[in-house]
């Protein structure tokens, strides 16, 4: 029975994470890039100003309270989404890509990330546009909803949209227990045991208690934790990695040469027949890139749709920034750490000194920090992997809510918390392989929806740019549902009136001050 399941899983995994699935992912990103006129390139200043730049200039981006009492801030949604995507793939996954595909794999990770920015943009635009309120007054959005109300609204596609939505939700729930929970916890427990000799059970119980306190408190509590955890963990790892790269600054030019040359080297990473090198570097770069940033999987949409935001494009731009931060920043820094410290052959990517690929980054940090190196990586993986658990707890919750309603989410959360100990103390084997497949299976219905609704994404984006950039006075496209659209417009009108009153009051105070002085 186990052998049969393993064989079937291997076949399915070879499709979703093989040439067919990766080609679909690549083509979707390319198609959305073309249809939006290269938004991630032409509007780079705009989306930077309205995402990370707005954190320091716009209080609405970080505001925790508004009339949407059950919503979370845009910054919180971004941190929770990054919590779900930044994980072991940013450390171990990069090392695997380099060893298996050569340094050139990093170039193809960048390509997948750049195109994936528009896939992420599109799915988040659709997530906000098709979201709806649940019985608690929370926003619920994600691929399930734009499959049902978007794809399902097209002629003859009602049943197809519903079936794909149910399949997506089922795959998401199963993946949340594996890649979103047990495999991350297993990685944490293994690294804590190796670095600090902490027993697996102790790590599991401790993390189970912490997870229960956070996850059972709902999205607000998860977002409150990730809002603080993600910036801290990113800064901690990036600073340590940058120190290593600076110490080996003389090797940086050679590292970039190896990346670009390896991307187009016909016989890189193991030699073989003509074109083998490009095939390997491209395949591993695409695969690890997709696994790292999750663009196209539809996972992060479920938390981004819960944000306190009216504009679908605003949340879409956060999706672009999330891919930029995950792959272009964190994965690139990890790659430079590996390539500049000499733990791999910089030309071929083959491991030196008999170091296993999953310990490459630790070896690089050991070369710079001595015995503290493995401890640094253990702490980094603790942050990265555990933040993934928190992010995926919300994804699974929303999938269960779609299928069974609010009552089902309570049962799910209890099971999710219990799985933490299982992940810490058991060898996962087939369970991990299955969850990897379920993770990939989420991608298929989501990408089909993005492609089918690409025209809607283009319309919403054009509407936004016409209003915000070109200054046209036209009705906004905020929601597909008339009742939500009207409510948002009424709230926007009220906010505009309050802003005018505040401005008038400020002018009166200034005039009054002048009168007193005279």
What is each of the regions a protein language model found here?
Residues 115-123, 204-219, 230-250, 283, ...:
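Selective recognition of specific alpha-helical transmembrane segments in multi-pass small-molecule
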Residues 1-84, 88, 99-105, 116, ...:
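N-terminal alpha-helical transmembrane segments of multi-pass membrane transport
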């Amino acid at each position: 029975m186990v052998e049969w399941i393993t064989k079937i899983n291997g076949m399915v995994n070879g499709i979703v994470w093989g040439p067919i699935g990766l080609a679909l992912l690549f083509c979707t990103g390319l198609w959305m890039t073309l249809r939006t006129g290269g938004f991630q390139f032409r509007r780079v200043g705009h989306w930077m100003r309205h995402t990370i730049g707005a954190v320091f200039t716009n209080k609405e981006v970080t505001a925790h309270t508004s009339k949407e009492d059950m919503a979370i801030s845009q910054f919180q949604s971004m941190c929770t989404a990054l919590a779900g995507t930044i994980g072991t793939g940013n450390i171990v996954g990069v090392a695997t890509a380099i060893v298996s595909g050569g340094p050139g794999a990093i170039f193809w990770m960048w390509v997948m990330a750049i195109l994936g920015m528009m896939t992420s943009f599109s799915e988040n635009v659709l997530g906000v546009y098709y979201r709806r309120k649940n019985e608690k007054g929370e926003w619920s959005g994600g691929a399930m909803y734009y499959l049902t109300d978007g794809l399902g609204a097209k002629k003859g596609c009602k049943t197809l949209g519903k079936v794909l939505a149910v399949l997506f939700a089922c795959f998401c729930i199963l993946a949340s227990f594996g890649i979103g929970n047990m495999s991350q916890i297993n990685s944490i427990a293994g690294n804590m045991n190796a670095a600090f000799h902490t027993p697996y059970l102790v790590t599991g119980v401790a993390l189970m208690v912490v997870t229960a306190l956070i996850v059972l408190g709902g999205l607000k509590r998860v977002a409150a934790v990730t809002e603080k955890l993600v910036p801290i963990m990113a800064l901690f790892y990036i600073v340590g990695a940058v120190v290593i790269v600076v110490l080996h600054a003389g090797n940086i030019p050679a590292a970039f040469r190896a990346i670009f040359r390896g991307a187009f080297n016909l016989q890189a990473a193991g030699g073989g027949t003509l074109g083998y090198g490009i095939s390997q570097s491209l395949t591993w770069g695409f695969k690890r890139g997709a696994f790292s940033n999750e663009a196209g999987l539809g996972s992060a949409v479920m938390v981004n749709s819960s944000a306190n935001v009216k504009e679908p494009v605003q949340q879409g731009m956060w999706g672009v920034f999330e891919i930029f931060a995950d792959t272009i920043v964190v994965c690139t820094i990890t790659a430079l750490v590996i390539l500049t410290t000499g733990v791999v052959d910089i030309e071929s990517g083959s491991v030196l000194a008999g170091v296993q690929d999953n310990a490459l980054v630790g070896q690089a940090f050991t070369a710079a920090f001595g015995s503290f190196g493995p401890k640094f990586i253990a702490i980094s993986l603790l942050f990265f992997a555990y933040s993934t658990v928190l992010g995926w707890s919300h994804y699974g919750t929303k999938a269960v809510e779609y299928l069974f309603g609010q009552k089902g989410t309570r049962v799910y959360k209890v099971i999710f918390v219990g799985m933490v100990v299982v992940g810490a103390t058991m060898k996962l084997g087939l369970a991990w392989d299955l969850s990897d497949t379920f993770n990939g299976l989420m991608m298929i219905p989501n990408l089909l929806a993005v492609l089918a609704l690409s025209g809607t994404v283009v319309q919403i984006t054009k509407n936004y740019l016409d209003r915000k950039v070109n200054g046209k006075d036209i009705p906004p496209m905020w929601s597909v549902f008339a009742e939500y659209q009207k409510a948002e417009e009424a709230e926007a009108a009220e906010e505009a009136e309050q802003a005018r009153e505040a401005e008038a009051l400020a002018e009166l105070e200034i005039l009054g001050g002048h009168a007193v002085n005279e």
